[in-house]
Each structure stands twice: as structure tokens, then as C-alpha cells.
């Protein structure tokens, strides 16, 4: 018997470009297995597909090795943050306070 096949998308936004791949996988495939089947690692060898954070439609997946993909899912590969948002806000506030003090 032939397993039903579903179509999903795999997306990654690198610093310099974005890639969206539409692939077909067997129904019941896990998120991690679908990601590996996409072949995106050949285009971005710096990606560690085993441990990189993943999401579907903006929602982080806690266990991509257990979560099954569904028809039409968009698997998103997340990059690490370049700067801690809290630290950036703190620096911005300090800079604004310094500018305000100079103007008084």
C-alpha cells in the first residue's frame, strides 16, 4: 500500500538571502525528518539541523523529533539572535538619558 504524501514548506532566512522550498513527504513524517529530507543543509552547510531551533508558522516547536508535520505546514529554521534584546534596550535607554542630560 502506498503511503499518503503531503506537501509542506521549509524556509530559512539567512543574513543575505531567504530560501523557501516546497517538498513532499510521507504523512506522519516528523518535523526534523522533513527538514533533513528538504536538502537545505546542502545550501547552508553552516546550519546544524540536529540542534537548531525550529517552528511552524511562528510557533517554536519544543520537540521536533516527535511533532508530525501536517499538510501545508511551513517549517521555519531560526537563527540565533545577534544581540540580546534586553541589552540592546538598556544601551538605548542609557544613550537617550545621556543625550537628555547634555541638552539640559
Swiss-Prot record:
A Pfam family the protein falls into: Ub-RnfH
Record PANTHER family: UPF0125 PROTEIN RATB
Family matches, as NCBIfam families: PRK01777.1
Recorded family membership: Belongs to the UPF0125 (RnfH) family.
Name of the featured protein: Protein RnfH
Gene from which the chain derives: rnfH
